[in-house]
């Protein structure tokens, strides 16, 4: 609410399974009431693929979360935006966003009557758990080389750190969500931006 009051376009990186957990039943309604754009990870539209990556039951909980968002008006038209994210597994780059999005829309609609607005394909950064996995399998250098040879200056204008900030649950601000994963705060918070507080030195 405070961010919206500042005239900021707010995006919620939503864990779909949380929407169905006890104590969070009103989250979807809150997001809709405040016209918050929702972005959620959905690695596949097939149950066996998702559960093999995220754990048993994650797919069905995610589907129920998407259905709930649809009931609140998300993904139906252009007003309440519901966008999904695809991340590839292993040392590979994501497929064409333009080619994958129609398949997602077709399958989720046919199988579960779910609608969404856009599908974003994101290349994995070799950090945190993914980076550790690459190192343990001896694939880190190979993946870094793949990123290097696949570099395209055409992509630079669209990188999210040029137009967005990430904010964690405590209000700390990061210049991209990858730096948020690494705990590298940008040195300010929503409170500080509003002139109300400062970020502790150990968070800068």
What feature does the model see in each segment?
Residues 1-23, 27-66, 83:
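Core AdoMet radical
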Residues 2-6, 91-109, 143-144:
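Short, electropositive alpha-helical surface patch
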Residues 6, 65-81, 111-115, 169:
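A structural motif corresponding to the C-terminal end of an alpha-helix
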Residues 22, 44-53, 81-96, 112-137:
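Flexible glycine/acidic-rich beta-alpha junction loops that bind and position SAM and/or redox cofactors
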Residues 115-147, 178-204:
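C-terminal accessory region of radical SAM enzymes
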Residues 148-182:
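C-terminal accessory regions of radical SAM enzymes
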